[in-house]
């Protein structure tokens, strides 16, 4: 009887080791699906490239990059903090700074030219940093990284959203959106 109890105990321990830890994966239908991107507010960050147009002042406009310090250096007014702000907020800030002793009634227009890159690591053939393209999904990102390795888990993906401290596991579906600055990690599957 002692051998049977010991065998059952060992089997229970072995099965407990196979159990999943942590919360279940989030269905991509719950967050960041393709149709919702237009409703989301994009916050600028390091690596973004912004096109600035100042009406009747072409020498003040151009394409400017957001530096690692979260600032963008513009002619005449110098460094402007932009990290964490929307394009509208930055446009208003620049307009106010230009109106403060430089131009009378300045009109400023801005748009994001190039978004910060996304990163993909783990069980893909070519892990690395890639340029973000509007409408990017997790499946597109995996294809950009030359597809899965033979050991890759193909049902879920882990994503750390830009600005978040932790990654979250998502069910891999065709509409799972990737955002600028996201880090995607494909894990190894268990046999």
PLM regions: where:
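Sec-dependent bacterial lipoprotein signal peptides
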Residues: 1-16
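Ser/Thr/Pro/Gly-biased, low-complexity, turn-/loop-rich segments
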Residues: 18-191
